[in-house]
Regions:
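A short, N-terminal "cap"/entry segment at the start of jelly-roll beta-barrel domains
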Residues: 1-28, 39, 111-166, 178, ...
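Residue-level detection of beta-strand-connecting loop/turn positions
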Residues: 13, 63, 151, 202-204
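Conserved short histidine dyad/triad with adjacent acidic residue
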Residues: 28-43, 166-182
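A generic "binding-loop/recognition-motif" signal
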Residues: 45-46, 64, 80-81, 90, ...
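Glycine- and acidic-residue-biased ligand/ion/polar-headgroup-sensing regions
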Residues: 45-57, 184-196
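Short acidic-glycine-tyrosine-enriched beta hairpin
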Residues: 64-78, 203-219
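A short hydrophobic beta-strand segment most commonly corresponding to one strand
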Residues: 75, 89-106, 216, 230-247
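Asparagine-centered strand-capping/turn motif at beta-strand->loop junctions
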Residues: 84-87, 226-227
Length: 263
């Protein structure tokens, strides 16, 4: 059973919500006003990622420890030893990505043991890959720029087989792709600023997504989007697994897992 949309904790001190729970992708929202974090660990089978939305967190990658504030994306590949810690009682919040999901949502709810969810705590230091293999960047300012025009900007933040993560900016009235589907991966969006107008499902039903809104199209679900304005819009886009999305952004003639909506 999928835990998409379920809330584990919601109190003044903390909130933990499962935004998506799929075999290829788990996304959670976590907010905290208390200190603490998990111990050092690694994942052998999946990628772990963090999008800091509010406040500041200390992240350890290997033997490096740095404070990362709102607007930072971290993507941590398999076998990089890591942990995070909220060091203050001021509010912080982040999105946490697991790709593939490895039953992480059930682990949060206490239904799956850590090892069965690919969470290896106190790992042998010699097993760890170099911290330099992780990605840490300011998602509105850094990354691989593949499009930068007055009407839109697209940056690739991470390009791994398990996950492609991008940051995009559209001005008002900018159109996205027409109605389409993906057959072998899911496509998801988290709105940062402004609004996007999505068309979803067989009837391309229109939905307005404002800041903080999460939208996910599983395989074979028709979707399209545009910015109807009045303001500029920015968002994060997740493709899991990546299925060639980054290569398509670099070369629009590249054939990848995207198809026109069925008639």
């Amino acid at each position: 059973m999928s835990r998409t949309g379920q809330t584990l904790v919601d109190m003044p001190e903390a909130t933990v919500k499962v935004l998506a729970d799929f075999p290829d992708f788990v996304l959670t929202y976590m907010r905290s006003r208390s200190e603490g974090g998990p111990g050092r660990h690694l994942h052998r089978q999946h990628v772990d990622g963090f999008i800091v939305l509010e406040g500041e967190y200390a992240f350890e990658l290997g033997d490096q420890r740095n404070a990362e504030s709102a607007g930072t994306a971290l993507v941590i590949p398999q076998r990089v030893i890591h942990r995070y810690e909220h060091e203050t009682t001021e509010q912080g919040a982040f999105l946490n990505i697991h790709a593939p999901g490895c039953d992480f949502a059930n682990y949060l709810f206490g239904e799956t043991p850590p090892g069965d969810a690919d969470n290896i705590f106190e790992p042998p230091e010699e097993e760890g890959r170099p911290a330099s293999e992780a990605t840490v960047l300011r998602f509105a300012e850094e990354g691989e720029v593949v499009t930068d025009r007055s009407e839109r900007t697209i940056r690739i933040l991470a390009d791994l087989p398990e996950l492609c993560l991008t940051w995009t900016r559209y001005v008002a009235d900018e159109e996205g792709p027409g109605p389409h589907i993906h057959k072998e991966h899911l496509d998801a969006f988290f709105i940062l600023t402004g609004e996007l107008n999505f068309g979803l499902g067989p009837e391309v039903e229109r939905v307005t997504a404002r800041p903080g809104t999460f939208v996910l199209a599983p395989p074979d679900v028709i979707h399209t989007f545009r910015n109807d304005g009045p303001a500029e819009a920015t968002w994060l886009n997740f493709h899991a697994p990546s299925k060639g999305f980054a290569d398509f952004l670099r070369d629009n003639d590249f054939v990848w897992d995207s198809f026109d909506a069925p008639a």
